[in-house]
Every structure is written in C-alpha cells, then in structure tokens.
Amino acid sequence: MRLPSFLRRFWSIATSPSSFLSVGFLTLGGFVGGVLFWGGFNTALEATNTEAFCTSCHEMQSNVFEELTRTVHYTNRSGVRAGCPDCHVPHEWTDKIARKMQASKEVWGHLFGTIDTRRKFLDNRLRLAEHEWARLKANDSLECRNCHSEVAMDFTRQTDRAAQIHTQYLIQTEGYTCIDCHKGIAHELPDMRGIDPGWLPPADLRASLPDHGSSFDLEGARAYVAD
C-alpha cells in the first residue's frame, strides 16, 4: 500500500532536509530550536533547584525540612538563610548537572515508598546520612564552600578552639574538610553509637581544648559544631 503523497513528502523532507530547504533556513531553524531547548532546559533545572520543589514530597517536608527550621542555618541574627539547594546542590553548572543525575534515583525511592513513613525514615537515617557524609567528603565539602571559605575567615572572631582547629586542619593540613567535624548542623544526627562522630577534636589537640567528653553526646556535638 502506497503512503499518501503528503506523508511521502514529509518523510523526504525529514530524511533529507537540505534537498528541500535552504542552508540559511536550516541554520536559522537550528538556532531558534537550540535557544528554545536551552531555555526550557534551564527553566526546568532551576525549577527543581528550589526549596519549594525539594519539600514538595512529604518525606522531606515532615522529616528533614522540619529539623532544618530549628537550626541557625534557617533562622539567625544576620537573616541569611541556607535552603535545601544551598547545601545539597553545587553552584557550578557541571557539578550541578552531575548532582542532579545522582539525585534522580531519589525519585525511585519516592515512588517505591522507601522512606514514606517516619518509622522507615528513622530506620534508614544512618544509611542516608553516611551516604551524604561520604559525598561531601569526596567533593571536599563543595556545597559548604558555596558560602564558607577558610581564606575569608577572621580567626580572631572565632573561639580559641575553632580558630586553632580551622588553622591547623583547613589551612595547614591537607585531607580534612568541613564535613569531617560539622555533621548534624542542619539535621538531627542518627544513632551514632559505634560510629566516629567526627565532631570530637583530633587526638593531638584534645589535651589543649575544652573537654566535651570522649563518648558521643548530642549536646556536646551541637556545642562543638556551633563553633
């Protein structure tokens, strides 16, 4: 059976456009199409990079976001607020795209109800936290450095403990990064028994710093990371 003439013509144009359309028209069409695609892509990208989008799922709204609202990152004397994307999405475009690709699997978690109840969330909290700590360790706390920079720190305005640790372990020593010490600053910590909390001062500094205890203590952790 022969195709109608208009379908045959459409197929010919689609498979060999240069035979029917001028190079200028094709170039202009490609440019316009590219602009529309790029504009639509970036619009969608920015729409998924907002606090409203992050908290549109009840898993986030009822658990981690509610915890964030009780921290200094959400309400503070300066009025500068860090939202979900500030801490979980890098600002540089290439790093942002890579993070979006990583986060796509979280959509499956939502669809299959991995943490759709408080009980499920608490049961998975340590696993989720360790995954995020490992990610921030691997990228040298890239999202923290969206706002914080050790070269811009005024150590004279920090506590003696914070100034000493920042100077020795961020300025003078390689291999350390923000998340090594500053866990639990925006969300509650999971059960840390048997796990190195990271907030204890390094062994070579403990003798010279105020003692917050040698075992895990939630209030001690909050006091330490607040510095």
Curated annotation (Swiss-Prot):
Heme 3 binds at C144, C147, H148. Substrate binds at K100. The chain crosses the membrane at residues 20-40. One of its GO terms (cellular component) is plasma membrane. Heme 4 binds at C178, C181, H182. Keywords: Cell inner membrane, Cell membrane, Electron transport, Heme, Iron, Membrane, Metal-binding, Plasmid, Transmembrane, Transmembrane helix, Transport. It is found in: Cell inner membrane. Heme 2 binds at C84, C87, H88, H187. GO terms for biological process: anaerobic respiration; denitrification pathway. Induction: Nitrate reductase activity can be induced by nitrate and not repressed by ammonium or oxygen. GO terms for molecular function: electron transfer activity; heme binding; metal ion binding. Residues 1-19 are cytoplasmic. The keyword Electron transport applies. Disulfide bonds: none annotated. Heme 1 binds at C54, C57, M60, E106. Pfam families: Cytochrom_NNT. Residues 41-227 are periplasmic. Binds 4 heme groups per subunit. It is a single-pass membrane protein. Its main location: membrane. Belongs to the NapC/NirT/NrfH family. NCBIfam families: napC_nirT (TIGR02161). Mediates electron flow from quinones to the NapAB complex. This is Cytochrome c-type protein NapC.
